[in-house]
């Protein structure tokens, strides 16, 4: 008879014995072979088997070991995390206690707010009153008196012609602040076409010492020599004024009073922007200046400046256009016959200064662009430099002046101003301020060479010269070795033969010290400060 399931000895069973108690109280484990016969497992197989020998014994379970490892790892991570948290918390507490202690030690701790603006490393020279002497009164106005004088630096054997601007006695604190603000701006600039301060003397009445400019202001210079000024000179001056204004823009300075009267002539080939009485320094993030009040030159101002007292570099561009118009008309008055109080309404209606007779449409269109109502539509100073530099390479194409090719201006060494100064003082050691501040090679080893440009070609006698332009500033320019127009934008103009003509000084009046009170005030300068009297060109 055949068993239905498995055979265990003489018995038929449904399953082989697994852990059945046998002899000697031992557990019996059997497995079924290929013939379905139950066979004994190896004695070492204590949990059953699947085949003969030790190979048939089942492996032990690894689950408990794995579980123990996972639990142990998690516990380690928790311990490490708690340790890091405690360390960071302790560090935060220590820093907080340190900061609290520092705040208690100091009365005030200002937070850092970097502006990103470069530091102003300009040098301001403080002069002693014994270092300079006043020679003659050049003029005076509401702000005080301007003298012609000499600066003799302490411990040095040089004499430098200077202009000394002295505030009047009993000046208000506001006027003192204004002149010191002007000194700050002038001391901060360093460009061949911008006047710079030489020094300041802090006596009871503040005195500004600037370079003496022998030819005076450009406005009177072009009026006096209009029959000898050719297209080359006019375009060169336009380039140089634009370069000076572009430098101010790069230094975040708004001039606010650019006009031909505020440009000084060092030589016929070299002009400098001056008069920083209204200039303002903008911050790194500032784009415009809002004025609160004071006298302003209405006829040179942009429309937004007149209406809203907003001043930007683009409002200076408007003033530049008016200045160019003054040059091209040889010193005509802008909007002559129109009261300053009506200028804003005239401009709002679209009226502008007319085209000068000598100007081609190319030049006049540049002026028109400067007078656009939309400030952003006006050209930048760097663009004006490029435009006028191109024109200066071919002057007769852009300015039509009868007899242009025969015109020339006197040599700088024929200056009547310096000649008068030398007749009164011992000028053996005189040097120009440019050479003193930026001396050329061999300056200290060869005194005679260094002074030749100032002393040569002085043969004629001098007479007092009348003027209607009072100096407000001088300058500290970078030396230019007698300065001749740069070849990239100038076709050199030189006289065919030396001229003995003497240039009348257009910016200074020679007045005796006893006659100061009788000097008529210059209408263009009298209202530059808040203490000034009324003037139609400068209105509140």
Curated annotation (Swiss-Prot):
Instruction: Please name every pair of cysteines joined by a disulfide bond in this record.
Output: none
User: Which residue positions are annotated as catalytic?
Assistant: 257 (proton acceptor)
How changing residue 270 to D affects the protein?
In thermolabile v-erbB
Q: Which domain of life is it from?
A: Viruses
Q: Which GO terms describe its biological process?
A: negative regulation of apoptotic process; positive regulation of epithelial cell proliferation
Which InterPro entries does the UniProt record give?
Answer: Egfr_JX_dom (IPR044912), GF_recep_IV (IPR032778), Growth_fac_rcpt_cys_sf (IPR009030), Kinase-like_dom_sf (IPR011009), Prot_kinase_dom (IPR000719), Protein_kinase_ATP_BS (IPR017441), RTK (IPR050122), Ser-Thr/Tyr_kinase_cat_dom (IPR001245)
One Gene Ontology term of the molecular function aspect: epidermal growth factor receptor activity
Question: Which keywords fit this entry according to its UniProt record?
Answer: ATP-binding, Kinase, Nucleotide-binding, Oncogene, Phosphoprotein, Transferase, Tyrosine-protein kinase
Query: What is this enzyme's EC?
Result: 2.7.10.1
For binding ATP, which residues are annotated in this chain's numbering? 138-146, 165
Identify one Pfam family in the record. GF_recep_IV
The record, for PROSITE patterns, names:
PROTEIN_KINASE_ATP (PS00107), PROTEIN_KINASE_DOM (PS50011), PROTEIN_KINASE_TYR (PS00109)
Q: Which SUPFAM superfamilies match?
A: Growth factor receptor domain, Protein kinase-like (PK-like)
Gene Ontology cellular-component annotations = plasma membrane; receptor complex
Q: Tell me the CDD domains matching this sequence.
A: PTKc_EGFR, TM_ErbB1
Q: Which residues form the Protein kinase domain?
A: 132-399
Catalysed reaction(s) here are: L-tyrosyl-[protein] + ATP = O-phospho-L-tyrosyl-[protein] + ADP + H(+)
Q: Which protein family is it in?
A: Belongs to the protein kinase superfamily. Tyr protein kinase family. EGF receptor subfamily.
Protein name, entry field: Tyrosine-protein kinase transforming protein erbB
Q: Which organism is it from?
A: Avian erythroblastosis virus (strain ts167)
Its gene?
A: V-ERBB
């Amino acid at each position: 008879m055949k068993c239905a399931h498995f055979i265990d000895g003489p018995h038929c069973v449904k399953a082989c014995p697994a852990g059945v108690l046998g002899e000697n109280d031992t557990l019996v484990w059997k497995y079924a072979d290929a013939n379905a016969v139950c066979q004994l497992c190896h004695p070492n197989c204590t949990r059953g088997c699947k085949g003969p020998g030790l190979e048939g014994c089942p492996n032990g379970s690894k689950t408990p070991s794995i579980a123990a490892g996972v639990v142990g790892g998690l516990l380690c991570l928790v311990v490490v995390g708690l340790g890091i948290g405690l360390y960071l918390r302790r560090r935060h507490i220590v820093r907080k206690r340190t900061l609290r202690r520092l705040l208690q030690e100091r009365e005030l701790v200002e937070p850092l707010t970097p502006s990103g603006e470069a530091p102003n490393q300009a040098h301001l020279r403080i002069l002693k009153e014994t270092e300079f002497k006043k020679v003659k009164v050049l003029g005076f106005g509401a702000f005080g008196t301007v003298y012609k004088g000499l600066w003799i630096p302490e411990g040095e054997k040089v004499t430098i012609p200077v202009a000394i601007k002295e505030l009047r006695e009993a000046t208000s604190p506001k006027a003192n602040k204004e002149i010191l603000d002007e000194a700050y701006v002038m001391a901060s600039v360093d460009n061949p076409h911008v006047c710079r301060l030489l020094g300041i003397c802090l006596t009871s009445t503040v005195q500004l010492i600037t370079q003496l400019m022998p030819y005076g202001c450009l406005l009177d210079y072009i009026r006096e020599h209009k029959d000898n000024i050719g297209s080359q000179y006019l375009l060169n001056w336009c380039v140089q004024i634009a370069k000076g204004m572009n430098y101010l823009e790069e230094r975040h300075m708004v001039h606010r009073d650019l006009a031909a009267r505020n440009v000084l002539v060092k030589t016929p080939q070299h002009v400098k922007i001056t008069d920083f009485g209204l200039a303002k320094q903008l911050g790194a993030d500032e784009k415009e200046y809002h004025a609160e009040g004071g006298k302003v030159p209405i006829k040179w101002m942009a429309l937004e400046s007149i209406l809203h007292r907003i001043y930007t570099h683009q409002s200076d561009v408007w003033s530049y256009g008016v200045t160019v118009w003054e040059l091209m008309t040889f010193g005509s008055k802008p909007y002559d016959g129109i009261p300053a109080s009506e200028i804003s309404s005239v401009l709002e209606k679209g009226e502008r200064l007319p085209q000068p007779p000598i100007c081609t449409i190319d030049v006049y269109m540049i002026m028109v662009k400067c007078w656009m109502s939309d400030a952003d539509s006006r050209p930048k100073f760097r663009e004006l430099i490029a435009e006028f530099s191109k024109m200066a390479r071919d002057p007769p194409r852009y300015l039509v002046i009868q007899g242009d090719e025969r015109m020339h201006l006197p040599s700088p060494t024929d200056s009547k101003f310096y000649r008068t100064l030398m007749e009164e003082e011992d000028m053996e050691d005189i040097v120009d301020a440019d050479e003193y501040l930026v001396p050329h090679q061999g300056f200290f080893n060869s005194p005679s060479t260094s002074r030749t440009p100032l002393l040569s070609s002085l043969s004629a006698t001098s007479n007092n010269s009348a003027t209607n332009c009072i100096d407000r500033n001088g300058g500290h320019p970078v030396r230019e070795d007698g300065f001749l127009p740069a070849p990239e934008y100038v076709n050199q103009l030189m006289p065919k033969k030396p001229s003995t003509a003497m240039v009348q000084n257009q910016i200074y009046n020679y007045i005796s010290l006893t006659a100061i009170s009788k000097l008529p005030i210059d209408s263009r300068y009298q209202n530059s400060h808040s203490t000034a009297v009324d003037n139609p060109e400068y209105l509140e």
